[in-house]
Amino acid sequence: MYRIVLGKVSTLSAAPLPPGLREQAPQGPRRERWLAGRALLSHTLSPLPEIIYGEQGKPAFAPEMPLWFNLSHSGDDIALLLSDEGEVGCDIEVIRPRANWRWLANAVFSLGEHAEMDAVHPDQQLEMFWRIWTRKEAIVKQRGGSAWQIVSVDSTYHSSLSVSHCQLENLSLAICTPTPFTLTADSVQWIDSVN
């Protein structure tokens, strides 16, 4: 089972949460995203299982809970990938111009990923950049790694993991799963509010 749920940070961060959870939220700029992620999780799973943190800080359910999840955010958008198949990773990015995106692609993309960029019309290369970037991030996050490891990931390399991508309007969404799964717009659930 794979479940992909998307929502808005600005809406979900104000949603009701189980007792005590709001008090656990960090202060500062990460607070709204943290609250929105917990709101998505508690909406999807009730009651919300205990959450622990891995060596690199990746949140997970306690080992006795046979479910895995990953959260990602970009701008006001947040994504949750939930699975009963094993460790998962997801990444969402708003497709937007980025001043140094070509330099970044040259610094971290593999030869195969560069070939994908070169295969599309120059007008489509920014979208392709975000497609490749989200795939790489999803793989790193599935492994529980840090963003610094993105350079060592080749999203064109065929491994035992399944990597799938979908563009949803101005969003690039990628998931990395331990078993085959094809991400489509129909497999994504949108949450407007949580009561």
UniProtKB/Swiss-Prot annotation:
Lineage: Bacteria, Pseudomonadati, Pseudomonadota, Gammaproteobacteria, Enterobacterales
Any single GO BP term: fatty acid biosynthetic process
SUPFAM superfamilies: 4'-phosphopantetheinyl transferase
Record function comment: May be involved in an alternative pathway for phosphopantetheinyl transfer and holo-ACP synthesis in E.coli. The native apo-protein substrate is unknown. Is able to functionally replace AcpS in vivo but only when expressed at high levels.
This enzyme's EC code(s): 2.7.8.7
GO MF terms held by the record: holo-[acyl-carrier-protein] synthase activity; magnesium ion binding
Keywords per UniProt: Transferase
GO cellular component: cytosol
Keyword Magnesium attached: no
Entry keyword GTP-binding: no
Name by which UniProt lists this protein: 4'-phosphopantetheinyl transferase AcpT
Name of the gene encoding the protein in the UniProt record: acpT
Species of provenance: Escherichia coli (strain K12)
